[in-house]
Curated annotation (Swiss-Prot):
Domain of life: Bacteria
Main location: membrane
Enzyme class of the recorded protein, top EC level: transferase
GO MF term set: hexosyltransferase activity
Keywords, sorted A to Z: Cell inner membrane, Cell membrane, Glycosyltransferase, Membrane, Transferase, Transmembrane, Transmembrane helix
Record-given protein name: Glucans biosynthesis glucosyltransferase H
Species name: Pseudomonas entomophila (strain L48)
Length: 855
């Protein structure tokens, strides 16, 4: 629609949202149409009236801040002469080709037998001989011996506890010729008992692995004599070579924008304070598909660049073609800019790292040319709910033992957790691109948990993967409540189950095959434990309801009594308790030895440990049920999504807790009732399980409260060193988060369409810079017409994304919304500003300014 037929509207409302001088505003107020206004702003006639708003993007963006952007050389033009912001470096493409997976051993054997070769692979290097490789192999054989030996002894004790002592009294020849029901009655107790024994062995071996890992970590940290730790190989604070350029990349997707950019700014300023800023570039790699959040990201990027003087160092890229999730996001970065950097540090959306930590990682890479990945041990901090503070305390107190223990057993063939780690770019690009898993179904397609796979591929290519467990200055945040943690666990569960398909892929190192196995067991142990408990209940029912057979052979003189050995039961129970809880006690002993002041003192840290143990006992059965559901959902192909409602202060509403935990509560009540009916004395053994399920709703809600978390901190309970003496990076993150929330941009897409400056920023940062081809123009016209017709509330997500990515369509929509006075858009924009208590105090309806009608 042309401006000549547009509805009259006030220019002053539009001009009020541009930071103009009184003289500029008075001059522009004489315009008679919005097309004329944009041409005056652009100081040149537009090629056509439809392009007037596009021509004024530059002046609308730079008014009041032109010198700042020009000094940083941030302004440029695209191939069509449209203004754009230099939000990313020039693209210098590098070839990134993922190797197709061949997960089927039989197919590989058949191809070899028939003389067909597999697809050529990138050349791999042999990891040079080193003493640590021999030591690591010996240590892992010792660990395997300890685990198997301990499990065999425990299994022997468990066999002695169970009432039916083996299959020796079952005559297999007889059961073949007797009626089926008699066979079932005779075999059922022994089958149950054997199944219980097998499950017990698997679960006990899993617990044993954790125990020996924590024990060796305790000894490593207590003595401090780890001669193989990677952090001891650097010469100290030597200058970083100019060619050792490092990219800090932060992949994000629909994240909390104020917190993301607060952590990024704190990290950036810490690197600047270290004096090594010229060796680092920062990239925010967005996969966000929520247009409101995407616009908020754009504004936050501009703000952090202005406030931290980060123009030319902090870059932003939002993908329009979102494939392969996070691994695809990183692939895209490597393909565009990876060849320009020697190293890459991957950050999570909640990561914060100190400049000294980052500089140390680069120095360690330089000092260890055979290292492909060096993973730090991030410290959890920054959350205030009771649940989060309990988890922060647990990871801060017990976590170092397990991290140091992992390093002890794995050395240079270790874990990579996907963030807060440095990666050598060249081998990563050549060997760690991830192809989709072949086939169909829930365990095919894009790899979800990319980190373990990338570490395995890096080691397969001949590069070491290390954990710098003692390197300070690496931080992360934990979920604020149980349900948010379980939401994350569902994705991790599906990803780890998918990764197990790579267990037999050719060339994988045995350690990383074990990593795939432990990743599966992290979640598969839950249904195994649940099945163990169900079978134990079934065995109880069998002993209670079925008439025992004391004489099972013809002419048997003496009855065969079920056996019970309480001394073995007590010994096995005590051993299991030691394996489960001794690592926690050792952690506190280590704190006593090293100094407990930062944890609130010896008494407080001990009391905190006891309370955390009680809390973990309450939560373990709840997690067991949820993880069992997640495993079943993955095998059944259910989508791994869980849309939780918005919550105030990250707390869990009672309604959501009832919906999520209600079935568990009913299960706990029914289970307890059944056991009480069968054998009330057995209920005492099952009480920790069913009691936790019954109490899951109030525990989930109460633990999510910030007030209780802060009260515990006031009492020095669950205190961690980062709360006792907060590092400057975390102080800065907290400060910037509060500032960002105060000025947070809401209803971003509506503002990008209607607001003069927000529209200019969105147009300048848009990436779909197509030419004037007829099909493209037709599509643009269709999208603009649809947006004007249905308004912001009726516009679907794909159309929103397409408009936000296209500077031409977005500027045309902006001009026509104002020219036609489209109330569907303008009223929502006004309401957004009215509802924003921290928006600039600009008049929406200026009364003292002349209201020229636009023809």
């Amino acid at each position: 629609m042309s401006n000549s037929s547009a509805r009259p509207e006030s220019l002053s409302e539009y001009l009020a949202h541009l930071p103009l001088s009184d003289e500029q505003r008075a001059e522009l107020a004489r315009c008679t149409s919005f097309s004329e206004l944009h041409q005056h702003l652009a100081a040149q006639p537009a090629a056509s009236t439809t392009e007037a708003a596009q021509a004024s993007v530059g002046p609308r963006l730079t008014v009041g801040s032109a010198a700042e952007l020009e000094e940083a050389e941030m302004l440029g033009v695209d191939a069509s002469g449209r203004l754009c912001l230099k939000i990313a470096p020039p693209i210098k493409r590098t070839k990134v080709v993922p190797e197709p997976w061949r997960t089927n051993v039989l197919i590989r054997m058949w191809r070899r037998m028939t003389g067909r070769t597999n697809a050529p692979q990138p050349p791999k290097r042999e990891l040079p001989p080193a003493r640590w490789r021999t030591v690591g192999s010996i240590r892992r054989y010792i660990l395997l011996t300890l685990m198997i030996g301990q499990t065999l002894v425990a299994g022997w004790y468990m066999k002695g506890i169970l009432p039916y002592q083996g299959w020796s009294f079952v005559d297999f020849d007889e059961i073949v010729h007797q009626p089926l029901w008699d066979t079932v009655v005779q075999v059922w107790p022994y089958a149950l008992q054997t199944s219980i024994l097998v499950l017990f062995g698997i679960l006990f071996c899993w617990v044993s692995a954790g125990f020996w890992t924590a024990l060796m970590g305790f000894l490593e940290l207590l003595t401090g004599r780890d001669k193989y730790k990677i952090s001891g190989s650097s010469a100290g604070n030597e200058p970083i070579a100019p060619e050792a350029r490092t990219a800090l990349v932060m992949p994000i997707c629909n994240e909390d924008v104020p917190r993301v950019f607060a952590g990024l700014r704190a990290t950036f300023e810490s690197v600047a304070a270290s004096g090594n800023l010229d060796r680092f570039d920062f990239f925010v790699l967005s996969d966000t598909n929520d247009t409101d959040i995407a616009v908020a990201e754009q504004q936050a990027w501009l703000d952090v660049c202005r406030e931290a003087k980060g123009f030319g160092r902090i870059f932003y890229r939002r993908r329009r073609r979102r494939v392969k999730r996070k691994s695809g996001n990183l692939d895209d970065f490597c393909r565009r800019w990876g060849g320009e950097y020697k190293y890459m540090v991957v950050l999570d959306a909640d990561s914060v790292m100190s400049g000294e930590c980052l500089s140390s990682l680069v120095r360690l890479m330089e000092a260890n040319p055979d290292a492909g990945i060096i993973q730090t041990g991030p410290k959890a901090s920054g959350m205030d709910t009771l649940y989060a503070r309990l988890q922060q305390f647990a990871t801060r107190v017990y976590g170092p033992l397990f991290t140091a223990g992992l390093h002890f057993w794995q050395l240079g063939e270790s874990h990579y957790w996907g963030h807060n780690a440095i990666i050598r770019m060249k081998p990563f690009i050549e060997h760690c691109a991830l192809a989709p898993l072949p086939g169909k179904g829930a365990f095919a397609g894009a790899i979800l948990s990319h980190d373990f796979v990338e570490a395995a591929l890096m080691r397969r290519a001949g590069w070491g993967v290390w954990i710098a467990y003692d390197l300070p200055g690496s931080y992360e945040e934990l979920p604020p409540n149980l349900l948010d943690e379980l939401k994350r666990d569902r994705r991790w569960c599906h990803g780890n189950l998918m990764n197990f398909r790579l267990f037999l892929v050719k060339g994988m190192h045995p350690v990383h095959r074990a990593v795939f196995l432990t990743g599966v067991m992290s979640y598969l142990s839950a249904p195994l434990w649940f099945l163990f408990l169900v079978l134990s209940t079934a065995l109880l029912a069998t002993n209670t309801l079925m008439e025992p057979q004391y004489f099972i052979e013809p002419f048997q003189l003496y009855p065969l009594w079920p056996q019970w050995h309480p001394e073995k039961a007590i010994a096995l129970f005590s051993t299991t308790i030691v394996l489960l809880f001794l690592p926690k006690l050792l952690s506190v002993i280590l704190i006593w030895a090293k100094g407990a002041t930062e944890f609130g003192g010896r008494v407080k840290v001990t009391l905190s440990m006891l309370l955390e143990m009680l809390f973990s006992m309450l939560l373990a059965p709840v997690r067991m049920i949820f993880h069992t559901r997640f495993v079943l959902a993955a095998f059944l192909g259910w989508a791994a999504t869980w849309n939780s409602p918005q919550r105030d202060d990250d707390s869990t509403p009672w309604s959501e807790a009832v919906r999520r935990h209600g079935p568990q509560t009913l299960l706990g009540i029914a289970w307890a009732s059944l056991v009480a009916w069968l054998n009330p004395s057995f209920l005492w053994w099952l009480a920790p399980i069913v009691g936790s399920l019954v109490l899951s709703i109030p525990v989930s809600v109460i633990s999510s409260r910030v007030r209780l978390g802060l009260a515990a901190r006031d009492e020095k309970l669950f205190l961690i060193p980062e709360e006792y003496a907060t590092p400057p990076e975390l102080l800065a993150t907290d400060q910037y988060t509060h500032e960002n929330r105060w000025h947070a941009l809401h209803d971003g897409f509506v503002r990008a369409v209607v607001d003069p400056r927000q529209n200019a920023l969105a147009c300048a940062m848009a990436t779909a810079r197509h030419g004037q081809a007829a099909p493209i123009e037709a599509l643009r016209a269709e999208r603009v017409a649809k947006a004007l017709e249905v308004g912001p509330k009726g516009l679907d997500g794909n159309t929103r994304l397409a408009l936000l990515s296209d500077p031409v369509a977005l500027s045309r929509l902006h001009e026509q919304v104002w020219a036609e006075h489209n109330t569907a858009w303008i009223d929502v924009w006004r309401a957004s500003i009215d509802n924003d208590p921290h928006s600039p105090l600009l008049p929406l309806h200026p009364e003292n300014v002349a209201q020229p009608a636009l023809a």
